[in-house]
Amino acid sequence: MIQVFSERKDKPVQYGFVDLGGAPLPNEVDYPTVEFSTSPDGINWTSAYDVKNMENVHCYSSPNVPVAKKTNQTKKIGFQDGERIVSTSFDSRELKFKLVYKGVSQTDAMLAFESAQRFLVSREAYWITFADWLGRMYYGTAVMGDPEFSVNDWTCEVTFTDLMGLSRSIGTSLSPVEDEWGVNNNVPNNGDYPPYTFKENKFSVYNLSDIYIDPERQGHQLKIVVKGAAGDNFQIKNLTTGDYIKRPKGFSGTWELDGVNPTLNNEGDLLNITGTHGGVITLNNGKNDFQVDNFSGEISFDFPFWRLS
């Protein structure tokens, strides 16, 4: 399990009704709060609530549902009317959220802003996620607008540039479902979460992303791990896309296809491989039917899910 958010029991919350003559609890505030965390690698996370010098710095307005910005590369075909799409890519986009600080002195307010800036502003891109949009993370960099000070308080708008133009699941297809798959995740209509480890030679792999998975042209992560024994002409074929990868010579042990790089028992295996584009497997959106020839053992598919929002 990946620990994304703080384990504190006293996280800031907006208070509700208070008994006559009563007072809010120390962790209750008069505005909504949304926890957010950052990570350099998508695995090791730091919540803003766990940064000591950001005490009382809260996100009170998280980003709206991000809009996907698509660009089509088109080409004129002979004398045909119009144009045809050659390729499609998603452009970077901006996610805006707002911070608020309420303190006891102007000095504390300035120090809190400095700490927030250190937490969010970096030369290097990183991942960010928000607790009200579970299971999704965005990769990019942030800039902070000028703070609006009011005695001991301030508010500030943060602009995060999502460099990929898509969100990614924090977990992968092999992660525990309840931990990292997120909400609104394209699970099939029967509501059952599909498996991604198989012992059969015919099975279906569900790509729950909003886009197809293409390790070669898009650099998407896709690791196929085969453990067992294979005879000559071992082959994995995606019957839905027509992609296949083939190894003429048999083997035993662990064979992996990590993106476009095949290995056998941790040794490079590219020279022994044939197939689509030299042995590349892609996944369509939704259901992909697979067939594995001349193999006995276990095969798993490990990849993150990509969302438009």
Where are the predicted features?
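Intrinsically disordered, low-complexity segments enriched in serine, threonine, and glycine
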Residues: I2-E7, L174-S309
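Glycine/small-residue-rich interface belts in oligomeric ring/scaffold proteins
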Residues: A48-L99, A112-Q117
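Solvent-exposed loop and beta-edge segments used for protein-protein assembly and interaction
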Residues: S89-R93, L120-S122, S150-W154, E216-Q218, ...
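"Short basic amphipathic alpha-helical interaction patches in structured regions
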Residues: A109-Q117, C156, T172-P176
